[in-house]
Amino acid sequence: SLILSVGRLTDAKDYPNLLKALLELPERYKLVIIGEGEARNEVERTILNYGLEKRVKLLGSIANVATYYSACDIYVSSSKWEGFGLVVAEAMSCQRLVVATNAGGVAEVVGDMNYIVPVSDPQLLANKINEVMEFDHETKMEVMYRNREFVLKM
């Protein structure tokens, strides 16, 4: 199962929270992070400290992120604070499952509090990712379609 997260590598995006959540998830979960920033060294250190180097890929900055949205099973935003949540809207417009922390305007973008968890709670984040990934195929398709429709109406 492929988890995608896109955003600058900064304290605000709280990647350590997402990495800690990944520790709670089964081995089959892999994480790809797209973005560059001043917290890259901290993120790399955290990956090594948690022994996640086989499960996490840092891809740096990438121009066309849409193909990555389409390739992932779920998009996760683990921010402590956030503005509008544009990348969440992009993921939803690509018909992806989305789980996000309740930071800034993200909850409004997602539009369904069932997919929102409190900030800085890796256990709840992991539980929600697992819950959504365990949906049956039909439910996943329904949610992904609804995500796209919701964003297109914004």
Positions of the model-derived regions?
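A conserved mid-protein helix/loop that constitutes part of the nucleotide-sugar donor-binding site
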Residues: 1-24, 38-44, 123
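Nucleotide-activated donor-binding/catalytic signature segment of Leloir-type glycosyltransferases, i.e.
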Residues: 44-60
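Aromatic "clamp/platform" in nucleotide-sugar-dependent glycosyltransferases that forms part
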Residues: 61, 80
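A short alpha->beta transition loop at the rim of the catalytic pocket in nucleotide-sugar-dependent
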Residues: 66, 73, 95
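Short acidic/histidine- and often glycine-rich active-site loop of Leloir-type glycosyltransferases
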Residues: 89-90, 103-116
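Short hydrophobic beta-strand element within catalytic cores of glycosyltransferases
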Residues: 97-100
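Conserved acidic donor-binding segment of nucleotide-sugar-dependent glycosyltransferases
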Residues: 114-123, 131-137
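A charged, aromatic-enriched C-terminal amphipathic alpha-helix characteristic of glycosyltransferases
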Residues: 137-154
